Amino acid sequence: MDHKNSQSASYAAAGVDIVAGYRAVELMKKHVARTRNDGCLDDVGGFGGCFGLPVAGMEQPVLVSGTDGCGTKVKLAILMDKHDTIGIDAVAMCVNDIICVGAKPLFFLDYIACGKNIPEKIAEIVGGVAEGCVQSGAALIGGETAEHPGLMPAEDYDLAGFAVGIVDKKKIINKDRMSEGDVVIALASTGIHSNGFSLCRKVFGIDNNNPELYIPQDSLGGKTIAETLLTPTKIYVKSVLALLEKVDVKGISHITGGGFYENIPRSIPDGLCAKIDKAAVKVLPIFDLIASWGNVPERDMFNTYNMGVGMSIVVPADQVETALDILKANGEDAYVIGSIIKNDEEKVILE
């Protein structure tokens, strides 16, 4: 059987534009340059990103890694044709995870899969990644943009990445040091962050590009549902690092998919439980809107969304005021939402 094609084939004819890839790299270089720090040993473009480890003063340096994406939040970015903040979400989801063990982010790498490489769009996305890196103190030392013609529609893309941080072994946050009477502090979120978008898409008709997405809502301070949902995930790294210098932090939870019920227990040891005062939680208006439009039960809301709390931190009762002062001085809306009690059956109770 003759498999030869009468027409000559090329990578471009197959849908992969190498020249566009080169242009995208050139356009993103200015964004990457913003993230350079003392650990960077080379420029973007090599086969591997080299980074010198800042281990001075550490007895047992430990590397901590985390990887994540933005979920289906990218669907809304695509619909709105707004791509300059979704990269912040990708970074936030990773660095907020590794700070939960006390690790200072060192560097970040991103991965973009797209149906068609449009250099200007890719540069916008990477610009957001760079902004997230600046906010967290991480260097953007590399990445990959993969063009997938035939696998993804031309306008679609997905974004993910991973972060690597460092912490001295003796300073790794150890939940086993937690005790009855410790206090749970909330750090306010900027909104839905990057989780629960599949439910949002159903409730608000995002996949059908519901016109109501673009109507200003009084309950959202005059903003539209679309722009409120696309608000970038808050990055807590620098605030938490400042806290760790002065306060005995015993546990941190990044409130992501699964909400309070799945994330708070991850930082609570056996035999103890975080008792959360629901009335103390400053629920953001967007969550009330999701609940009312979708008729979503309260339990499901707290089991899906952050509800206005992007991170919870456990500290000793006698250090609460110091912790709040430090966090507020670093721009956080921080407040007490609960305490640690003895309980052999549950690790979080909301009442």
Annotate each predicted stretch with a short phrase:
Residues 24, 28, 50, 94-95, ...:
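Buried hydrophobic packing segments
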Residues 17, 68, 181, 254, ...:
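Residue-level signature of catalytic and energy-coupling elements of molecular machines
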Residues 67, 158, 171-221, 225:
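Short, acidic (Asp/Glu-rich) active-site segment that either coordinates a divalent metal cofactor
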Residues 102-104, 199, 248, 333:
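Short loop/turn motifs at secondary-structure junctions
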Residues 27-190:
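Glycine-rich phosphate/pyrophosphate-binding loop regions near the starts of catalytic domains
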Residues 2-39:
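N-terminal amphipathic/basic leader segments beginning at the initiator methionine
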Residues 2-13, 121-139, 152-159, 210-214, ...:
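Glycine-/charge-enriched secondary-structure boundary and capping motifs
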Residues 16, 20, 86, 195, ...:
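A generic structural signal for residues located within well-ordered alpha-helices
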